[in-house]
Structures are given as C-alpha cells and as structure tokens.
Amino acid sequence: MVSKIRVLGGTPLRGEVTVRGAKNLVPKAMVAALLSAEQSKLRNVPLIRDVDVVSDLLRMHGATVDYDQEAGVLAMTPGSINLPEDSVEMDTLAGSSRIPILFAGPLLHSLGEAFIPDLGGCHIGSRPVNFHLRVLEDFGARRIQEAAGMHLIAEKPLKAKPVHLPYPSVGATEQTLLTAVMSQGVTELTNAAVEPEIMDLIAILQKMGAIISVDTDRTIRIEGVDKLRGYSHTALPDRIEAGSWACAALATGGDVFVRGAEQQSMTSFLNVFRKVGGEFDVQDEGIRFWHPGGELRSMALQTDVHPGFMTDWQHPLVVALTQATGISIVHETVYEERFGFTEALNEMGASIQTYRECLGGLPCRFGQRNFYHSAV
C-alpha cells in the first residue's frame, strides 16, 4: 500500500480521463442485490475500497460475488443467505464503512434478523445512524444492543409506515427504500433525499420489480411487493470525480476532457465553475473543462442537498478558489466538520480562516452548535 505520494506541481493539467460509476451509488446497488435470490449484474464499477468491503460482506452472508476489475463488471448471486458466525471478522471487514447498516432491511426480509457491527465514520462529521434505526424499528424490527454491535430481529413480516425525515439524509432515504420495497403496505417517505444517486438506486429497484413513485416535493411512495428479481444495470458516472478533475484543471490553468461526465447531474457545479472563471463544453461523450486565461473570480458559496451545490465538490473548489482574486466565502451546511483539509492548504501558502458562524448564506442547522462550518 502506498503511504506517500510525491507531487511535482507547477504544470497545467492537460489530457483526458474517464470516470467510472458513482461511489455514492455502487455499494448501495450491491446491497440491493440481497433483495433477490437471482443473480444481479452491475457495470461501470469503480476500483474503490467500499466495493471490496461490500463484496466481502456479501460473501460472509453466503452470496457469490465475481468482480471483473478490468471490465468494471460485478456479478452477485445471493443464493442461500445466512448470518455470519464471526461478528469480530465482520467488524474487521467493515472497518469505518457505514455500509453495513444498509444490510439490515434486506436481511430482515430474508432471514428475520440482521447483525450490524459497531459503525465507524469519517472525518467530516458525526453521520449518526439514528434515522436508520428509527426507520427499522418503525417497520417492526426490534433492536438488541450487544458488545460487538446491534442485533436486529423481525418476529413478524415488516409493515410499511409513514416516514418523515427531519433532514433529507441520503443514508436514511436509502435505508427506507431498501426496507420498504418488500414491506407490507405503502410507505410514504417525506423530506427525502433526491440526489442523482438516489434516483439511480430507485431505477435499479424498479428493474427488480419494485413500485416506487417520486413527487416534486421530496415525497417518495413505495408500494411493498412480495418478491423481487435480479437486475442488470450500468451505474451512473461519478459526479464527484468529474468535478474534482474540473477543479484541478481550473486551479492549474489546464484543459481536461472528462469522458463520462454528465451535464444533467452537474448543473449546479457547472454554474459555479463558470462564475469563478472556468469554461466548459458539454459533448456527447463527456465534458471538457478548461481555464480560458485571465484571473479567476472570488465568490460566496453555500453547499446544500441536491439540487444545490454538492458538499463533496466543496474541497476541490476551495483549492481552485485559492488561485482566485479577492476573498471567497464558503458556507458548509451538510456536514459540520468539513474544513480540516484547509490546515494543509495553509501550510502550502493559502490564507484560509474557518468560523463557527454562518457566513455568506442563510443560517443553517450548525449555526448555534459551535462547529467550524464557514471558511473565508
């Protein structure tokens, strides 16, 4: 494993790259395969750690997983599902991944029980799982806290319940979808996340036989069905990776063609990219991003849930804004601790200060909670 990367800078980034499937979709699509005993096939799969983690967890539960890394194709056959006997090994495999909590719904449907190891997180916020647990318990699951994690039991078939999310959490929306599709009755999920990756997961579930409708007011209705089949699907491109390449081209005065990038899922990013001073050309096979010359412009920006400016685009954009003329303000409203990387940028010569106050936008849920969530 590489422990250090040495980068020789000072050269504009030029050339062509290809993005693979979205990291915020693929692991969840793999979990969805557990909802059917039939084989599911997923294409455009990226080489990321979460794919390895979910593959190992699927195998631990009795599924067969074949991954052609060169072709980017995963074939998953659940077959006879069972609970792993070694919870310690399961915890070790999962590491800091949040994915295991999403196994709960499919396992409760097939086995009537699920075990979730102690969940880690990341360095950008607490990411609590209380929304997930509330959904599972409302649908009829009983939770037993054990030393190594949580044991969830469904003594009767899960039954649909209305679900309202106090915040449009992506993870809680995924949990509701994966649990509701085979629960008895109709689930109405309000204040749901509607990110492109959520829409692609819904497309997968619909291919499997689910009945799901999405309204314009963040309401998703899921009619439970008795049985689902396997799916064949090509994952949508990773808009985070595409935005990162775009910002790298902008920060270095370069010119990069990102094959596979899609305009539809990057509308808010493209608007910001152009406002800062970048230029782009949407083509059939991808998007070309380049620095057209002249000075980059500073700006005030606020991250938000979709269709707002994605929080994952904030890091690479801040790097590009260090090259802009004037003072930029970035207000992070999705995760409470997402400016730790600015310390490294300051060591490299940037001038960035973080604040607890809501700057450059409307007050957000972190405004009175003592989190450094604004940067200047």
Regions found by a protein language model. Name each.
Residues M1-V376:
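Short, structured segments at the rim of ligand-binding sites
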